Each structure stands twice: as structure tokens, then as C-alpha cells.
């Protein structure tokens, strides 16, 4: 064999099979690079500052301010970069982006368990270019890190069930890392239980489930010990997080939204026009396919009669239970605690699988797993009264998978009898890929405009901090309060206390929807709170009348008050 033939064999064996994945990584890498440059100009957001300050502590450079109600895993990853000497907000952006791309690789591999390489590439690109993904990637939030670990956890779960039970160890480790990144990752217990039930006969060696659980405990024990030291209660952060889901919030609180259809209404703004096109084609395809099938009335009639006329009472009972549970889920959705809805939907999934399993649909268990994954987070975030577009991030992989599945199924059914029908989907995917890339190119320049307020806030706080350090050289020994506390603590590198927003005899953490109409009683409540806590200085984004404090400097909307 010649050197040329050896080279071609090497390329065909080791390079060509991975070309779609490599291309996907390159595209995502280029998009992420430009997104990083934009974020470096915008600066950190409030939550990012919390992660950065926690990371300073873990790197041995703590400044006195921490928020230990936030899970520790993401700050620990940032702390590794800090230990290498790169102490900057950019560290959080880079870690966020790198793990997001790591998650994208896992998503491609998960897709490849059912789809071919071209389809998996397209599904990965679809997920990577959802407007909500591009908009929020690189912010230095923990959502993408959690999402990446969840993706890999599900990938290893499928491998553990279908190929080698040893993968259960990796499944539990990634699930634990996801949980320690965002506590609501615990919700994947529902799709996991459903998937294991669907494949209970296929698990070859149950002992590796035990080994996986043990590995998870070894990973989580240091964190529990840390919480014991900080709070005197190893469960406090978990209780605080999940307790908030049952807490009553005032409608004045700015993220408050009781609409259970919040994420459905914003669906196409999160997923982009390309998802609208795909959804439209899926609906049209189903309609056309139904019309074609209905023409063959005898075929339809025979199938219906074969189901209805069966003397299988067990089947009829399952159909009845499925219908009742589905109706209960729909009627009670948004009216009961999210955990009730999660359990009802799990029951719906279990009954549905027992009904459809006899049809021998290829990888139906995988499709149900992904759908239940999406629903686990959709139910929780829709019922929880505190809503944010960023919470859609953990639903996005499931959406991309289901859109790809629907599109591929429709194309297969409608083109199966066409000559060269197998080329129609790749051609369509290529056209839509070009459209997606053009849309992404037009979206990137607009991101900075969307975060203009954050950029200005960072600029003003940086200037105010520099001025204040010169004005009060002993500032680290002063008691400082602010309603912009994470920003200020990061810029001053010192402890800054949380200042609540007082309105209508209530205290709000993080502001209110209407911050323009404060009464004298509201101002008095703010003043008394500062006095009672011996505040020397107060940095505020709101102009308020404080009887015990005077404004000494203003930078844009940032006002510095000093105690009289």
C-alpha cells in the first residue's frame, strides 16, 4: 500500500467520521469567540459577580463577601483559573463558554444514538444557535455548566443501559456535578426513573448503580462538610433553594410572574425563526400524511377496529388510565405544587410507554426520555412564580432534539417513495443551516444593545469605586451597603452588605417592578434599616431622601450616600 493510500485510509478512518462534529465545534467556537468579545465589553452581570466573589474565596483570595446559597461547583471551576493567575471577570465568561461547547459535544453524541451524522450536526447547530443560547452564553452564569453536565449524564445513562453498566458510574458523577452547579438538576430524577423502568430488563449489571451512587457520595461529601462549617447545617442551601419554590412572593417583585404559559408564549423568541419554520413544516407534514392515510379508509378502519374490538381489558384499562391521568395533568397544571405535576406526568409517561411499546418504534425509549427531560424543567419553571428567560436554557436541548425528530420523521414518511428521497432532508438541512448562520451573524451585533444598561452600570460603578477608594482610603473597615451589592463588592474587592428595596411596608431583595414611586414612608424604612445596621456608606441606583445620610457623589444613576 502506497503512502498516499495509507494517508487516505487514515483520513477515512480517523477524520472523516468526525468531520460533522469538528465542523460543529468550529462554528460554535467562532460564534462563542465573538460572543466573548461582546461580553468583555459589557462586563459582568449581578449573578456573575456573585460567582466571581465566591471563586475568589475558593482560590484563597477572598474579600469578605460571599453568597453561599449559590451552588459551589461553578465558582470552583472559575477558582482554578484564578489560581493560575488570571483574576478577571473574563475567567467566568471563558469557563462558561468552554463548558457550553463541552455540552454541545455531548449533545451531538446523544443525537448520534438515533440520528445519522448529518442530522446530528444539524440538531447540534440548531441548539447552538437558538437566540436564547447565543444571547446568554458567555455571561458567566451557571446555567450552561449545569446544562452541559445534564446532557452528558443522560448520554452516559443511555450507554449504561444499552451497552455497558459501568457507565452508570459516569452517569451519577455527571448528575452530581450538575446538581452541585444548579440544585434544580435534581429534577432529572423523573426522566431517569422513567427510562430505567422502560429498560429494566436490559440493565446487565445492577452493582454499577451502587458504585455510581457511592462515587456521587464521595464527590458531594466535601461540599456537605463545607456547608456544615459555614451554616452549621449540611442541608441549608438545598432547603433554602427548594424552600423558595413554596415561598409567597409579592407581585411587586420584578421577576414575579404567575403565568404557567410564560415559556410557551416566548417559545419562538427563544428558539428563533428557524424553529418556527421547522414547527410549521412538521404541522403541515402531519396534516398531509394524515390526509394521505385517511384516503385508505379500509386500512384505518381495520386498525381502529382491531384496537377497539379486542377483548383485551388490560389494554382498555391502560387507555382509560392514560386518558384520565393526562386530563388531570392538564387541568391541574399551574394550579398545584410543581412536584405534584411532576409525579402526575411521570405516571403519564409510564402508562404511555406500556401502551406504545408493542408498536416496536425504534428508540422510542430515548425519545420519551428526552421529552420527559424537557418536561421536568418545563413543569418546574412554569409553575414556579419566579420566571426568567434564562431558565429556558435547561429545556433547550430537549427542544432541539424533538424538533429534529419531528422534522426527520415527517421527511421520511413523505419522501419514502420518491426517487432520491433520501437526499431531500440533507438538502433542506443545508439550506436551513445557511439561514441559521446568517441569522446568527445578524444577531450578534445586537447583543450589546440589549445589555446596554448593564454595560453602563458596570462603567459607572467602576468609576464610582475608583473615586470612593481615593475619598475613603479606609473603606475596607467601613460598613457599606448597596442595592447593587454584587457589582460593588467585585469592583471594590471588599464586603458590601445587601440593601433591600423597601416599598409599601415590605422589603424586596433585588428591586421591584416600579422603582420610580417611593413614598416618604418607604424612604424612612430605608433610612432606619441603614441606621439600625450601622451603615457608614450607601451606594444606590435609586435617588431617595434619607434623613441620616447625605449624597456626596453621583455617577450616572449610581449615587453615593454618607452617614451624617
Give the residues covered by each predicted segment.
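Perimembrane helix-loop-helix junctions
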Residues: 3-6, 159-164, 175, 188-220, ...
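Membrane-embedded, lumen/periplasm-facing catalytic core of multi-pass transferases
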Residues: 426-488
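Short acidic/glycine- and proline-prone juxtamembrane loop motifs at membrane-interface regions
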Residues: 46, 70, 132, 138-146, ...
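Membrane-lumen/periplasm interface segments of specific transmembrane helices
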Residues: 31, 50, 207-289, 296, ...
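Short periplasmic/luminal acceptor-recognition loop of GT-C membrane glycosyltransferases, typified by
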Residues: 469-507, 535-541
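Hydrophobic/aromatic-rich transmembrane helices and adjacent perimembrane loops
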Residues: 56, 143, 178, 187, ...
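Membrane-interface transmembrane helices that cradle and orient dolichyl/undecaprenyl
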Residues: 112-118, 153-168, 178, 359-360, ...
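Signature aromatic-anchored transmembrane alpha helix within multi-pass, membrane-resident enzymes
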Residues: 21, 173, 217, 314-326, ...
Amino acid at each position: 500500500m502506497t503512502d498516499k493510500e495509507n494517508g487516505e485510509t487514515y483520513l477515512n478512518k480517523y477524520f472523516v467520521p468526525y468531520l460533522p462534529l469538528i465542523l460543529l465545534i468550529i462554528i460554535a467556537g467562532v460564534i462563542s469567540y465573538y460572543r466573548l468579545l461582546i461580553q468583555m465589553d459589557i462586563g459582568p452581570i449581578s449573578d456573575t459577580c456573585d460567582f466571581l466573589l465566591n471563586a475568589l474565596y475558593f482560590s484563597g483570595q477572598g474579600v469578605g463577601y460571599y453568597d453561599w446559597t449559590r451552588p459551589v461547583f461553578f465558582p470552583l471551576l472559575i477558582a482554578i483559573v484564578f489560581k493560575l493567575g488570571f483574576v478577571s471577570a473574563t475567567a467566568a465568561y471563558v469557563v462558561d463558554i468552554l463548558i457550553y461547547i463541552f455540552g454541545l459535544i455531548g449533545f451531538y453524541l446523544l443525537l448520534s444514538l438515533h440520528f445519522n451524522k448529518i442530522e446530528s450536526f444539524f440538531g447540534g447547530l440548531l441548539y447552538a444557535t437558538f437566540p436564547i443560547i447565543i444571547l446568554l452564553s458567555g455571561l458567566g452564569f451557571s446555567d450552561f455548566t449545569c446544562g452541559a453536565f445534564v446532557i452528558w449524564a443522560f448520554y452516559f445513562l443511555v450507554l449504561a443501559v444499552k451497552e455497558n453498566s459501568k457507565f452508570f458510574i459516569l452517569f451519577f458523577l455527571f448528575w452530581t456535578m450538575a446538581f452541585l452547579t444548579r440544585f434544580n438538576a435534581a429534577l432529572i430524577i423523573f426522566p431517569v426513573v422513567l427510562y430505567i423502568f422502560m429498560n429494566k430488563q436490559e440493565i446487565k449489571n445492577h452493582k454499577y448503580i451502587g458504585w455510581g451512587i457511592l462515587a456521587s457520595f464521595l464527590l458531594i461529601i466535601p461540599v456537605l462538610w463545607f456547608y456544615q462549617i459555614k451554616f452549621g447545617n449540611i442541608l441549608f442551601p438545598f432547603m433554602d433553594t427548594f424552600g423558595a419554590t413554596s415561598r409567597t412572593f409579592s407581585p411587586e417583585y420584578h421577576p414575579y410572574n404567575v403565568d404557567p404559559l410564560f415559556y410557551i408564549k416566548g417559545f419562538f423568541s427563544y428558539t428563533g425563526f428557524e424553529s418556527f419554520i421547522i414547527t410549521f413544516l412538521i404541522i403541515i407534514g402531519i396534516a398531509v400524511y394524515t390526509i394521505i392515510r385517511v384516503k385508505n379508509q379500509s386500512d384505518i378502519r381495520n386498525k381502529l377496529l382491531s384496537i377497539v374490538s379486542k377483548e383485551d381489558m388490560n389494554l382498555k384499562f391502560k387507555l382509560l388510565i392514560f386518558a384520565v391521568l393526562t386530563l388531570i395533568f392538564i387541568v391541574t397544571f399551574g394550579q398545584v405544587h410543581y412536584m405534584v405535576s411532576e409525579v402526575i406526568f411521570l405516571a403519564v409517561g409510564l402508562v404511555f410507554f406500556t401502551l406504545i411499546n408493542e408498536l416496536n418504534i425504534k428508540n422510542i425509549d430515548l425519545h420519551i426520555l428526552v421529552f420527559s427531560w424537557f418536561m421536568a424543567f418545563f413543569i418546574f419553571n412554569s409553575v414556579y412564580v419566579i420566571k426568567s428567560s434564562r431558565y429556558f436554557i435547561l429545556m433547550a436541548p430537549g427542544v432541539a432534539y424533538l424538533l429534529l425528530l419531528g422534522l426527520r420523521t415527517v421527511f421520511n414518511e413523505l419522501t419514502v417513495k420518491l426517487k432520491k428521497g433520501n437526499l431531500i432532508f440533507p438538502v433542506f438541512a443545508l439550506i436551513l443551516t445557511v439561514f441559521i448562520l446568517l441569522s446568527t451573524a445578524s444577531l450578534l451585533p445586537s447583543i450589546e444593545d440589549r445589555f446596554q444598561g448593564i454595560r453602563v452600570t458596570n462603567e459607572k460603578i467602576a468609576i464610582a469605586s475608583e473615586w470612593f477608594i481615593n475619598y475613603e482610603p479606609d473603606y475596607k473597615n467601613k460598613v457599606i451597603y448597596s442595592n447593587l451589592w454584587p457589582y460593588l463588592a467585585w469592583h471594590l474587592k471588599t464586603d458590601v452588605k445587601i440593601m433591600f428595596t423597601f416599598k409599601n411596608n415590605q422589603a424586596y431583595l433585588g428591586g421591584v417592578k416600579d422603582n420610580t414611586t417611593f413614598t416618604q414612608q418607604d424612604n424612612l424604612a430605608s433610612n432606619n434599616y441603614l441606621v439600625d445596621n450601622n451603615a457608614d456608606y450607601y451606594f444606590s441606583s435609586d435617588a431617595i431622601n434619607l434623613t441620616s445620610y447625605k449624597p456626596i457623589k453621583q455617577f450616572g444613576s449610581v449615587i453615593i450616600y454618607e452617614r451624617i
